[in-house]
From Swiss-Prot:
Gene for this chain: cobS
UniProt KW Transmembrane keyword: yes
Enzymatic class: transferase
Alphabetically ordered keywords of this record: Cell membrane, Cobalamin biosynthesis, Magnesium, Membrane, Transferase, Transmembrane, Transmembrane helix
Residues annotated as transmembrane: 1-21, 35-55, 59-79, 101-121, 123-143, 171-191, 197-217, 227-247
Name listed for the protein in its UniProt record: Adenosylcobinamide-GDP ribazoletransferase
Taxonomic source organism: Mycobacterium sp. (strain KMS)
Keyword Metal-binding on entry: no
Disulfide bonds: none
């Protein structure tokens, strides 16, 4: 378990985890990925709190700094995956052509727009969260729910897209029970994030459900999942949860 968690940090963050202490990327590492989300969410929440202290309550700049820390801590690979996935979904042609577009490395119009929307929505939503522990919990929930969505994308029965090295190592590795346990845990964690006790859990479930539909569409379009699809699942879910938690 320790090796899997270390592997999850090595895979999902810039932390210099010693190679000898990590498990090989696969089922165990992916199962531990939401644990990385908890830590990243706590760091982002601390930055949001510090920014709110420095710039005033509900400062958009504080929200932007929290998002920036997440981007730095993850090497921006998830937001890059969102951009590539949106570009792939936005092109015409066979799955092979869509995959070539995704592997091109440059962001198209759709991909660039998706980055702006995701970063902007997360920034504003984080800044609108209530102060104190409720707001901190909200950030942790949003970031962790994104990693639970990655497990949904790797659940049993989901294939890897042709030629995807990362997809081939993690696709279909997560049993439904693992996904449900993590989903229930994050939904329970979301209870104190809002004044209405049902709003947080409902937001998490709806967001993860929406991402499951996105993953299904990606499987139809690309023939399976790729590392970019995992990044898209993480960013979409994080964004939807953050926005859902600030609905009045």
């Amino acid at each position: 378990m320790i090796g899997s968690l270390a592997g999850a940090f090595a895979f999902g963050t810039v932390l210099p985890v010693p190679a000898g202490s990590t498990a090989t990327l696969g089922r165990g590492v992916m199962t531990a990925l939401p644990g990385v989300g908890i830590v990243l969410g706590a760091v982002a929440a601390a930055v949001l709190w510090a920014g709110s202290w420095a710039f005033g309550p509900h400062s958009a700049l504080a929200g932007l700094l929290a998002v920036a820390v997440l981007l730095l801590a993850t090497r921006g690979m998830h937001i890059d995956g969102l951009s590539d996935t949106v570009d792939g979904l936005g092109c015409y042609g066979a799955p092979e052509r869509a995959l070539r577009v995704m592997r091109d490395g440059s962001a198209g119009a759709f991909g660039a727009a998706s980055i702006v929307v995701a970063v902007g929505a997360q920034t504003l939503a984080f800044s609108m969260l209530p102060g104190g522990w409720s707001g901190a919990v909200g950030v942790v929930v949003a970031v962790t729910a994104g990693r639970v969505a990655a497990l949904v994308a790797c659940r049993r029965g989901i294939p890897a897209a042709e030629g995807s090295a990362l997809g081939g190592r993690v696709a279909g590795t997560q049993p439904a029970a693992v996904v449900l346990v993590w989903l229930a845990a994050v939904a329970a964690l979301a209870i104190p994030a809002t004044e209405r006790i049902w709003q947080g859990p409902l937001t998490v479930v709806v967001a993860v459900g929406m991402t499951a539909l996105l993953v299904r569409h990606c499987v139809r379009r690309f023939g399976g999942i790729t590392g970019d699809v995992l990044g898209a699942a993480i960013e979409v879910t994080t964004t939807v949860v953050a926005v859902g938690l600030v609905i009045r």
